[in-house]
């Protein structure tokens, strides 16, 4: 990174377009209509809490609404223009300004880049949130609105949340806040009470696949795009991360090892661990660990009697049933929780990632073999 390069953005996924640059939003027509109706009523609430799983379009909707408000300014102007959705043409000056991050009436808050440490700060700091004081204290330019977008509120600490609460409690005229939250239950209840909650839902696999199809950064064939869409569980952001991290190949390798439990092919395990844990392969690490966690979650659901999920590898469903029956549901829940704690600790302490992967599979091997061991001792 050169000194002249812009600072990285924590709310941008890899080389993919930032939500403010994204013109199309699929699968969220109900949420879009709710915002449109609120604005056209002339009684637009000043703060909106956009909730739902990560990567489903919450920030994209926030920027889409911000462009609409800044373009039209009032319900009367929007009605006169015949607006029936929140779309702003890409060649419109407002779209271009917002996409460039240069519109004076939008303030975007995210985890800041630490130039000295050359990494993102771990929290959305109180100093970042306090920027709202000066921003909303200035008179707005064209359109009369000032809009703050927080992506994501999950990154705030208590001090940041209290700073946000102050501005939410005394909102200036013609101010709008869009607060993106993946797990809103973790926010201060007083913040939630000041906002109108808009719950957004995961997308259909076909919608996720359509976004992948339209992306210039996704080179996968149609079958693989659909597989990534299904693995993403309705999250475009997740599907793009799977693509970037070589997720389909990783998933096949992971499942091949899991299907052999309680026996492990040590050679293949080390090959997988090297692939996930190699230096500089952050995408592969994040994607591989996430996919393994998802597989274990589906295993627990299977053990609890949930309907079988579609399989992505031949024989996967039968192996999942077999493993679910190889130990009690409590044991699988316990190991799932322990693995989550192990990964979190490894991230915090910068532990050798290969050792983490080997330990994870050792734990799984132990649980999968426990039932057989009990029979032998009996």
Model-derived regions, located:
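Charged, glycine-rich active-site and insertion segments that engage polyanionic ligands
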Residues: 1-68, 72-80, 84-87, 93-97, ...
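Conserved alpha-helical scaffold flanking the Walker A/P-loop in AAA+ ATPase domains
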Residues: 34-39, 92, 123-147, 155, ...
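Conserved D-loop-proximal element of ABC-family nucleotide-binding domains
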Residues: 126, 158-159, 189
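Flexible beta-alpha connector loops of hexameric P-loop NTPases
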Residues: 116-126, 153, 197
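Conserved Walker B
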Residues: 152-156, 168, 184
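Residues at the beta-strand->loop junction immediately N-terminal to the Walker
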Residues: 51, 150-151
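Conserved catalytic/switch belt of AAA+ P-loop NTPases
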Residues: 137, 162-176
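Loop/turn-to-beta-strand initiation segments
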Residues: 142-147, 172-178
């Amino acid at each position: 990174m050169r000194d002249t390069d812009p600072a990285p953005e924590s709310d941008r996924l890899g080389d993919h377009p930032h939500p403010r640059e994204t013109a199309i939003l699929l699968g969220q027509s109900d949420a879009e209509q709710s915002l449109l109706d609120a604005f056209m009523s002339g009684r637009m609430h000043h703060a909106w809490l956009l909730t739902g799983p990560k990567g489903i379009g919450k920030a994209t909707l926030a920027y889409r609404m911000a462009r609409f408000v800044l373009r039209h300014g009032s319900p009367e102007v929007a009605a006169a223009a015949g607006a029936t959705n929140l779309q702003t043409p890409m060649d419109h000056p407002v779209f271009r300004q917002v996409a460039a991050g240069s519109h004076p009436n939008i303030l975007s808050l995210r985890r800041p880049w630490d130039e000295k440490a050359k990494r993102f700060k771990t929290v959305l700091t109180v100093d970042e949130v306090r920027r709202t004081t000066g921003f909303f204290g200035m008179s707005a330019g064209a359109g009369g609105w000032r809009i703050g977008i927080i992506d994501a509120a999950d990154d705030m600490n208590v001090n940041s949340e209290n700073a946000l609460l102050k501005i939410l409690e005394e909102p200036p005229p013609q101010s709008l806040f869009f607060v993106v939250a993946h797990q809103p239950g973790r926010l201060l209840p007083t913040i939630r009470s000041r906002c109108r909650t808009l719950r957004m839902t995961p997308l259909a696999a076909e919608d996720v696949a359509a976004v992948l199809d339209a992306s210039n950064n996704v080179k996968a064939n149609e079958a693989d795009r659909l597989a990534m869409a299904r693995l993403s569980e309705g999250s475009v952001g997740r599907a793009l991360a799977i693509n970037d991290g070589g997720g389909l190949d990783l998933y096949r390798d992971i499942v091949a090892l899991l299907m052999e439990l309680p026996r492990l092919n040590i050679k293949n395990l080390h090959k997988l661990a090297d692939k996930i844990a190699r230096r500089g392969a952050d995408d592969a690490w994040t994607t591989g660990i996430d996919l393994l966690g998802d597989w274990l979650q589906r295993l627990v659901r299977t053990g609890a009697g949930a309907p079988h999920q579609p399989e992505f590898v031949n024989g996967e469903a039968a192996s999942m049933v077999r493993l679910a029956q190889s130990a009690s549901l409590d044991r699988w829940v316990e190991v799932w929780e322990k693995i989550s704690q192990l990964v979190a600790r490894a991230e915090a302490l910068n532990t050798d990632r290969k050792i983490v992967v080997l330990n994870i599979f050792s734990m799984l091997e132990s649980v999968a073999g426990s039932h057989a061991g009990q029979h032998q001792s009996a």
